[in-house]
């Protein structure tokens, strides 16, 4: 690392600590020429994600938009804000692990619905009603009956997505 005082490229690391829950590293360095001490930070460069919408358009992934949708589904449910933020982080991590930085919106929606179904069925139904564009009470009843019949989270979600695309 180049010394900001003398420009020398040689230094030694005096101290190194993980910060931000292990997502960054803070290093205290000392220039081997002039002895000046300085701090550097290292972070993993995250892949920029994009969302391919149902109409074919592509837009930059918006964490806040995902957060708002999940918060609305979980409104007045026994889930803390910290749990919601962890939930959103998990969805983003799963999306970042995909092969392409362009994620179809239905993939994100499916991930959200699968996770919601395991933590809060009411929130799952709320989210599904908006995401799958329910038209009437019959749509709600169909999802509720599927929830009762299917134990695994992934069983009814693909059926919902197929029904919503008709």
Swiss-Prot record:
Its cofactor is Zn(2+). One of its GO terms (biological process) is negative regulation of DNA-templated transcription. Transmembrane segments: none annotated. Coiled coil: none annotated. Keywords: ATP-binding, DNA-binding, Metal-binding, Nucleotide-binding, Repressor, Transcription, Transcription regulation, Zinc, Zinc-finger. One of its GO terms (molecular function) is ATP binding. The keyword Ribonucleoprotein does not apply. The keyword Ligase does not apply. Residues 49-139 form the ATP-cone domain. A zinc finger (unnamed) spans 3-34. PROSITE patterns: ATP_CONE. Binds 1 zinc ion. Negatively regulates transcription of bacterial ribonucleotide reductase nrd genes and operons by binding to NrdR-boxes. Belongs to the NrdR family. PANTHER family: TRANSCRIPTIONAL REPRESSOR NRDR. This is Transcriptional repressor NrdR. The gene is nrdR.
């Amino acid at each position: 690392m180049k010394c900001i005082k003398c420009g020398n490229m040689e230094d030694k690391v005096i101290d190194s600590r993980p910060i931000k829950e292990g997502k960054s590293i803070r290093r205290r360095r000392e220039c081997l020429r002039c002895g000046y001490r300085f701090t550097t930070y290292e972070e993993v460069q995250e892949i920029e994600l994009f969302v391919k919408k149902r109409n074919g358009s592509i837009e930059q992934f918006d964490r806040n938009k995902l957060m708002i949708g999940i918060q609305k589904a979980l409104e007045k449910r026994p889930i803390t804000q910290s749990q919601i933020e962890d939930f959103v982080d998990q969805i983003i991590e799963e999306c970042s692990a995909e092969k392409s930085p362009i994620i179809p919106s239905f993939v994100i929606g499916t991930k959200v619905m699968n996770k919601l179904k395991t933590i809060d069925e009411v929130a799952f139904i709320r989210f599904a009603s908006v995401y799958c564009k329910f038209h009437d009470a019959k749509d709600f009843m169909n999802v509720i009956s599927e929830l009762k019949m299917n134990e695994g989270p992934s069983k009814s979600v693909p059926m919902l997505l197929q029904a919503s695309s008709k």
